[in-house]
Every structure is written in structure tokens, then in C-alpha cells.
Amino acid sequence: MATVSRRAYAEMFGPTVGDRVRLADTGLVAEVEQDFTLRAGGYGEEVKFGGGKTIRDGMAQSQRTRAEGAMDTVLTNALVIDHWGIVKADIGLKDGRVAAIGKAGNPDTQPGVDIVIGPGTEIISCEGNIVTAGGIDSHIHFICPQQIEEALASGITTMLGGGTGPATGTLATTCTPGPWHIERMLQAADAFPMNIGFLGKGNASLPAALHEQIEAGVIGLKLHEDWGTTPSAISNCMDVADATDTQVAIHSDTLNESGFVENTIAAVGGRGICAFHTEGAGGGHAPDILRVVGEDNFLPSSTNPTMPYTRNTLDEHVDMLMVCHHLDAAIAEDLAFAESRIRKETIAAEDILHDLGAISMMSSDSQAMGRVGEVILRTWQTADKMKQQRGALPEDGARNDNHRIKRYVAKYTINPAIAHGISHDVGSLEVGKWADIVVWKPAFFGVKPAMVLKGGSIAVAAMGDPNASIPTPQPVHYRPMFGAFGGSLARSSLTFVSQAAMAAGVRERFGLAKQLSAVRGIRGVRKQHMVHNGYTPRMEIDAQTYTVRADGQLLTCESATRLPLAQRYFLF
């Protein structure tokens, strides 16, 4: 039998079992755990498109029609990185969803084929490339629509949050308040190649005004201290969420005016809730909001300006905070408010809590103390910093960082999907889910995608000069593709709403073009459901020194002076 060297095979068909891939310029190494393309019984039946290659009529391309099972699109020889595994596979897409992950080809001439290539099948060659599920940013201030373009080009395909544009309330809080604004924002969402869900304002002590927002189409409610996150408002908001199977996200009381962290925990009453920017620089009970990391019903997340902890982190935060929360540097009380939120001890501990799997999610806090295009980038910078400072995780050996990689990819994919009741549609590369897929060259993993698919259509890609004779000449930059235009846009993206809104027929009432999907299964979600990130330690924060301990272990680390995925990739 003819043989080929491992290197030559990887260069031709991509890595296979036992091969390792470095993720961009980080120190993280992924090792292929399984190769689904070998289901034919071994090597030799791989599919590849191109002149003289195998995906040709009568070879790896069958005669089967779409009705007979041929796929719409097949991504060949992809290295899949997801919470469930790091595997080599072909991926079949049909009707805008993932139809199969396995072995592609022609079942009439090849054994073991479960993804049929036919004359009606498009091919995206992923040999040597990494494929991930589209990212989810669950902390969006919808301040300007251009955020969506920026996020999509970074690999984010779902944005959850609130706002109405650059209104003062939106600059500070992630709320789309009231039925009129909710209707307008749902109508605006039709224009963008992005899955979108809105949060209403949850700060009220009586339920009627909250119920009308749920029925108008929000997927949950946001409690924000700038609107008054009192125990009364918290309790009322939680009652409404329980009645409607929606989520509550909380930005608690930094000043401890209406109560301390213990009072907030008591008002929540053991019910599930999303804790935004759990460390506290983004807001929350000072100095010990990190206490909630030890509560099973709090689903903790970080926003990206504090991630990872670097020598510049503290300096930039005061000015950011003053702008975002409409504060005046000439007023001593405003300045004290800002400074109370910025503590190097808790910021340093935040990195380690992520590495332990105790903080479950990552998000941006877009234009409101966070950078919308850096959720994925900051996640992998944190993973690399923790490997450099803490070494390999106990679950990982000397050969690879697979467990750490799965832990960190889950923070911006499956875990926010579970927390917000949308994991039936998005959050992972699994059969039946919406085909929101990001393709990366390994050298650019986590920082600059090669292309982003929305609902099976290419929505954005790194594309060269449109007047060039081939697609690659400079200037290469992100350009919208056909999936981002016309009727294709509306059919390639989802708008998430509440079950109550779906039952009320908001799509017809508001004249919405996009397909709606109702959030569900939220109220029973707990920390233990956060994939690879369910550790719930006993938390202690010293009120005088701000030192942090988890299960008695002191959590501290140095600020980084160098990071991967940084200036090397952003020369211009």
C-alpha cells in the first residue's frame, strides 16, 4: 500500500488524529482527538475539491438530488473546536442548519459516507483550517448599529442586550425600555446579518410594566443600578421572569445604598440569574460582588475590558467609567464612585476564576466599558496568560491544552446560549442547530476569521480587491458577502423573543421579516449547567485589603506586560 508522510498528509488534507495545532501566536496547543473522516475504515477515502481532486462527477460527487439527501454545502476536512471535542470532520449543511458532522462523499462509490455530496452541493474547503460555532455576546449596549458589523467580522453571530441607540440610558444600561422601543428595535434587527435578542428594563417594584415588555418581544429583563437595583425591584423582576420563562441579568448596587451583596442574594431568593461583570469593575456591590461566584443560582460572566489583567487595565478604567455612567470628574462623590469599582486585587483574581471554570461566560459590554470586536480575542488572551502563569491544567498533559481550550471556547458559545435559553438553536456545532460557523486559519485563530457563515450563507469574509483577477490581492479586508444582502439576510439570521411574544404574534403585528425563535428552558438553569465552567467555590473577599480566596486558596496573579493576538495582528 502507498504511504504518505504525516506532514504531507496534514498539508494536503489537514491534521488528523494525534496531530497538534498551535492557536495563532498563543502558547495553546490543540490536539486532534478523533477523525470522523476515517469512518470509511481508514485513510484513502478523503474528499477534496479542485483540479485533479476527488470531488468530481462519479468520484466523490454522487448523482443524488437534494430530495435524495444531497447537502446544500459541505465544509471538508475541518478541524472542529467545540465544547464537546476537538475533532477532524466534514460538516454538512442543509436548510440553514447543521445536518451532519462526519464523513462526506459519494455513498455509491465510497464506504462509510453519511454526508452526501451531489451536483447541487457547494464546497467550502477547510483543509488546514479551524472551524468553530459562531460566538455569542450576551452583554450588548445597542448604542450604534455599526457595532454589529464589527462584531460579525470578529466571529460573533449572536448579540443579546438592550438599548435604543446613543440615548443616555443606553450609554449606561443594557435595556430596551417599553413596548414602543422594543417594537422599533425588533424592526431594526431585520436589517442586520446577526441573531439578535433584546433585554427590557427590569427596574420596577410592580409587575405590570415588566409583563408588557416581555409580551412585546424581549427575551429577558435587565436590572441596572443606574435605574435603582433595590431588593424590591430585584424580587419583583424575578417573579416576572419565573412567570414567563425569561432570564434576568443584574448589575447590582455598587454604592450599597439599598443593601449589600447579602441583601441582593437574599432578594434573588435562590432563583437563576445572570450576573454581568461579576468582578465588579463594570459595576456591582463594592468590594465583594465576587461573592456571587460561590452561589449556584448565579450564572457569572465577565466583560472584556478587565480581561486579561495587564499593566494598562487599571489606568484606562476611571475615564471609561466616568463617560459610561454620566459622571462628572469635578464632583468628588462621582469620582469616588468610579474609583470604588476599580480594584487590582479582584481584577487579578478574575483571570484565575476563569481558568478554574468558576466564572462561566465572557461578553463585551459594548461601547459602555467594553469592546464589541474583542470578546473572542480577549478570551484566548486570558487562556494564554493563565497557561503562562499557572501552567497546564490538571486535566491536560504535556502534549496539549485540549481541556483548557474547551473550557474557554464554551465561555462565548454554549454557556451564554444555555443561560439565555437559546441553546436549541445556537451555541455549538451540533446537528440540528443553526449553521452559524466561523472558519479560521490557525495563524489567525481568535483574532481574524477567514469567513463567517450565518444560517449556512457566507455573511462576511476577508476579501481582496474586487477588481483584481483573483480574490486574494491587497487590500484584503472584511467585506459583506451575499448572505448579508436582500432576502437572504432575513432568512439567514434569527431574532429571539419571549414565548409570550411569540404567542401574541409579534412577527405579524410588527411586520418582521426575520424568523423568530422563542427562548425557553431558562428558569431551571444553574451554575452546574455551565459546560466546563461549573465550579462553585466558597468565596471570601476581604473588605479592607480586597484579597480574594476561593475554597481557602488565595487568588492573585501578575499583570501581563505582553499578550498574544495583539499588535502583531493590527499593524494598521
Swiss-Prot record:
Gene source species: Paracidovorax citrulli (strain AAC00-1) (Acidovorax citrulli)
Q: How is the cofactor bound?
A: Binds 2 nickel ions per subunit.
**Does the keyword Transcription belong to this entry?**
no
Q: Which cofactor does it need?
A: Ni cation
Report the EC code(s) recorded for this entry: 3.5.1.5
A Pfam cross-reference name: Amidohydro_1
Instruction: List residues binding Ni(2+) 1.
Output: H139, H141, K222, D365
Q: How is it modified after translation?
A: Carboxylation allows a single lysine to coordinate two nickel ions.
Cross-referenced InterPro entries, in alphabetical order? Amidohydro-rel (IPR006680), Metal-dep_hydrolase_composite (IPR011059), Metal_Hydrolase (IPR032466), Urease_alpha_N_dom (IPR011612), Urease_alpha_subunit (IPR050112), Urease_AS (IPR017950), Urease_asu (IPR005848), Urease_asu_c (IPR017951)
Quote the protein name from its UniProt record: Urease subunit alpha
Q: Residues that bind Ni(2+) 2, according to the entry?
A: K222, H251, H277
Residues the entry annotates as binding substrate: H224
Binding partners and assembly: Heterotrimer of UreA (gamma), UreB (beta) and UreC (alpha) subunits. Three heterotrimers associate to form the active enzyme.
What positions are modified (N6-carboxylysine)? K222
Q: Which family does it belong to?
A: Belongs to the metallo-dependent hydrolases superfamily. Urease alpha subunit family.
- Active site at which residues? H325
Question: Mind listing the UniProt keywords for this protein, alphabetically?
Answer: Cytoplasm, Hydrolase, Metal-binding, Nickel
Tell me a Gene Ontology molecular-function term this record carries: nickel cation binding
Its UniProt entry gives the catalysed reaction(s) as: urea + 2 H2O + H(+) = hydrogencarbonate + 2 NH4(+)
Give residue ranges for domain Urease: 134-572
GO terms, biological process? urea catabolic process
Q: Which PANTHER family match?
A: UREASE (PTHR43440:SF1)
Q: What is its main location?
A: cytoplasm
Pathway, according to UniProt? Nitrogen metabolism; urea degradation; CO(2) and NH(3) from urea (urease route): step 1/1
Where does it reside?
Cytoplasm
A GO cellular component term found in this entry reads: cytoplasm
